[in-house]
């Protein structure tokens, strides 16, 4: 059987940490920041670790562990 291909969209958006967790950028930061609270803007800065349910789905898109 041939190797499974990695989803190109997923490899651009997610990183796997050394412990196997999935890191991604926080959502909701593209536009409309004027109506967001300062706390939301601060908390959405940088990256976050995905929840276990979401990480399980993303790992299917990254079979070779990029």
From Swiss-Prot:
Keywords: Ribonucleoprotein, Ribosomal protein
One family name in Pfam for this protein: Ribosomal_L35p
Spans traversing the lipid bilayer: none
MF GO annotations: structural constituent of ribosome
Gene Ontology CC: cytosolic large ribosomal subunit
Biological process annotations from GO: translation
Top-level taxon in the UniProt lineage: Bacteria
Family, per entry: Belongs to the bacterial ribosomal protein bL35 family.
PANTHER family named among the record's database cross-references: 54S RIBOSOMAL PROTEIN BL35M (PTHR33343), LARGE RIBOSOMAL SUBUNIT PROTEIN BL35M (PTHR33343:SF1)
Protein name: Large ribosomal subunit protein bL35
The species this protein was found in: Brucella anthropi (strain ATCC 49188 / DSM 6882 / CCUG 24695 / JCM 21032 / LMG 3331 / NBRC 15819 / NCTC 12168 / Alc 37)
């Amino acid at each position: 059987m041939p190797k499974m291909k990695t989803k190109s969209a997923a490899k651009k958006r997610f990183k796997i940490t050394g412990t196997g967790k999935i890191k991604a950028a926080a959502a909701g930061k593209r536009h409309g920041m004027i109506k967001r609270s300062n706390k939301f803007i601060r908390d959405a800065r940088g990256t976050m670790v995905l929840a276990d349910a979401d990480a399980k789905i993303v790992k299917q898109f990254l079979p070779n562990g990029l």
